[in-house]
UniProtKB/Swiss-Prot annotation:
Main subcellular location of this protein, as a coarse class: cytoplasm
Domain of life: Bacteria
Name the UniProt record assigns to this protein: Ribosome maturation factor RimP
Keyword Cytoplasm: yes
HAMAP family (alphabetical): RimP
Matches recorded under InterPro entries: Ribosome_maturation_RimP, RimP_C, RimP_C_sf, RimP_N, RimP_N_sf
UniProt keywords, alphabetically: Cytoplasm, Ribosome biogenesis
Family: Belongs to the RimP family.
Name of the gene this protein is made from: rimP
PANTHER family attached to this UniProt entry: RIBOSOME MATURATION FACTOR RIMP
Subcellular location: Cytoplasm
Function noted in UniProt: Required for maturation of 30S ribosomal subunits.
GO cellular-component term (any): cytosol
Length: 204
């Protein structure tokens, strides 16, 4: 079964290099993307297994990953390395994510049309085998739970809600890395910016 952590061939190669480094530090790789542009950007999202990663830990991961990439040298051009937390309205990239975040709202997009649509919005209802379960609106005041094969998914992301913010605050407190100032302006914005550490453009 595939996942949404790394989609392209180069992303998967990079993930193979950095995953052991990240996991060896006690974290998990959530998503990896090598973005094009004037200077290429390697974007890495990582988190604690129980959530609550902070910016200092992102910086530590960035340093370790940069050293590993120096050895392997998989990217020919100069690039910038960015390591961040998934943020509150995080992407869902692994089948297990849909179990972890059961009961929270999400948006899911599929690669092909499913019953005439590609986009689904609703409450996550866990998984069943290789299917993601989501409860969606089916007419006025009527809801139905459907199953989407994980391999059909092109993108999936949590929707920012008060319940989700409360859960993220709980994770931060449980991790011992709670900084209330990080959440002061959440109600005034559409989403929470992720903790992030950036390495300057470099050639590895």
């Amino acid at each position: 079964m595939s996942d949404l952590v790394a989609k392209t061939a180069i992303d998967r190669r990079l993930a193979d290099i950095v995953t052991p480094v990240i996991e060896g530090m006690g974290f998990e790789l959530v998503r990896l993307r090598l973005m094009s542009g004037k200077t290429r950007t390697l974007q890495i999202m990582a988190d604690r297994p129980d959530g609550g990663i902070v910016v200092d830990e992102c910086a530590e991961i960035s340093t370790a990953v940069s050293a590993a990439l120096d050895v392997e040298d998989p990217i020919e051009e100069n690039y910038t390395l960015e390591v961040s937390s998934p943020g509150i309205d995080r992407p869902l990239t692994r089948l297990k994510d849909f179990d972890v975040w059961t009961g929270y709202e999400a948006r899911i997009e599929t690669t092909e049309l499913i019953d005439g649509r590609r986009r689904f919005k609703g409450e996550l209802a866990g998984t069943e085998g290789d299917e993601v379960l989501i409860t969606i609106e089916d007419g006025r005041d009527s809801y139905v739970t459907i199953g989407l094969k994980f391999d059909w998914l092109a993108d999936a992301k949590l929707i920012l809600t008060e319940e989700l913010i409360a859960e993220m605050l709980r994770q931060k407190k449980a991790s011992g890395n709670f900084d209330e100032s990080q959440f002061d302006e959440i109600e005034e914005s559409e989403g929470e910016e992720a903790d992030e550490a950036e390495q300057p453009p470099t050639k590895h």
